[in-house]
Amino acid sequence: MSNKLKFYLLSGPVLVSFIFALTSPIIQIYFVSRVSTEIFAAANMLSTGLAALVNSSVAVDRIMRWYKKHFYSIVIIDLLCFCIVSFLSTEYITVRFLGLAILNAVSTNLWCVLMRNAVNNIIKGDSLTKWESFESAWNLGGQFFGAALAIYFIDMPLELCIGLQCIANIIMGTTDYKAWDMLWKGKDAKL
């Protein structure tokens, strides 16, 4: 795996881990304190049910081929919907919980499954385990430093936190887009 590919595969997720750890305390406290128990429970149920359906569909070769063919569309739809849902949710709390439940279960889930599948296509066995551990360590490092800074940035405006999460997701979408090309079409591809 080339260093450029490693950079694309690591930089977006590490940035997302860092930004979400930095901003999530403010966002979660704000929204959880304003949502009803019924909406919260419905969002959990919706997310679980949809994720089960989506993950079941990945096992069907014909459907998985369709997902791979439409990877870019899945990422773009996920990014657009995440930003729309995130900003609408400041006025409509229910939109956040139900919208993100659907996104996390469907498009975000597919995005992650497809990226893992692409990496699994070029790395196998012990090398795959080492890569996944390396990737996890970097993501946890980003999360750790984001959480450490969150202790000091407790007064960030909600809109700034939401904006930072949207920007981090867009950057991750861009790096995954480039990594996808390298994994399936570039010199790192192993078909």
Predicted regions and their residues:
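Loop-to-transmembrane helix entry/capping segments in MFS-fold secondary transporters
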Residues: 37-38, 123-135
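Hydrophobic core of transmembrane alpha-helices in multi-pass small-molecule transporters
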Residues: 14, 93-111
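Glycine/proline-centered helix-kink
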Residues: 24-25, 140-151
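Helix-loop boundary and gating motifs at the non-cytosolic
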Residues: 2-52
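Intracellular juxtamembrane helix-capping segments at the cytosolic ends
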Residues: 27, 109-123
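Helix-to-loop junctions at the C-terminal end of transmembrane segments
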Residues: 54-68, 154
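Symmetry-related core transmembrane helices of the 12-TM Major Facilitator Superfamily/SLC fold
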Residues: 159-178
